[in-house]
Design a protein with these regions (language model features):
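Short helix-coil boundary/hinge micro-motifs
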Residues: 1-153, 161-162
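Alpha-helical elements of the RecA-like P-loop NTPase motor core of helicases
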Residues: 8, 181-184
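Cys/His/Pro-rich metal-binding microdomains
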Residues: 155-160, 174
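Cys/His-rich microdomains that often coordinate metals
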Residues: 158-163, 181
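Cysteine-rich micro-motifs
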Residues: 168-178
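Contiguous alpha-helical segments
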Residues: 185-193
Length: 193
């Protein structure tokens, strides 16, 4: 199963043995991620010839941080991902920024007492704005769709990912994270002895 676009965007930060890796760290890596996900972006922009400027890359990073803030709000009271919990924008600001990014599309994410819901609006924009709108719209669709209730934060040591819980006994985003968590638990138990 391919993860929804909103989840892939949120998980462009990942933990490796050498620390955090950011898929948007450079214009080249940003272009590679956009090209990989082009079919899901809802844009006619030619991504093969596109190398994001530093401003474009920064705008995509900001959008990702806003999306991660919405993920963090959604999983609460479960703790958010440890990658950026301290540097995420406040939820109301993130929600406004996410909705503003949807401008060329027709969907907005509304948040009421019962949680997320879809609202509509129509505007126009340039190529990068349509890419960002595709990402923002995918996020709105994700949080107002049926799979949002399955979103979890991976509790494994050093993991910073969100994942969809596809099985009642699933606790981690991957087998590797499960192994790392069990090894850490085993080490902690034997260290106390």
């Amino acid at each position: 199963m391919v993860d929804p676009l909103a989840l892939r965007l949120a998980n462009t930060i990942r933990a490796t043995s050498s620390g955090l890796t950011d898929a948007f760290a450079t214009p080249e890596s940003t272009r590679e991620w956009l090209q990989t996900n082009a079919a899901h972006l809802g844009t006619r922009m030619d991504l093969d010839d596109y190398l994001p400027s530093e401003a474009d890359r920064a705008a995509l990073v900001e959008l990702r941080q806003n999306v991660r803030a919405v993920f963090a709000e959604y999983v609460s009271p479960q703790p958010p991902s440890s990658a950026d919990a301290a540097v995420l924008p406040p939820f109301p600001e993130a929600l406004t920024a996410l909705n503003n990014a949807t401008a060329p599309t027709q969907r907005l994410l509304g948040w009421g007492r019962s949680g997320p819901r879809t609202l509509e609006r129509v505007l126009t924009a340039d190529d990068l704005d349509t890419v960002m709108a595709g990402l923002a719209d995918a996020t709105v669709e994700f949080f107002t769709g049926p799979v949002a209730s399955q979103i979890r934060t991976c509790p494994a040591p050093r993991c910073v990912r969100y994942f969809l819980k596809s099985h009642p006994r699933q606790e981690w985003c991957s087998v590797a994270c499960g192994n790392r968590a069990r090894a850490a638990r085993h080490y902690a138990q034997h260290r106390e002895d």
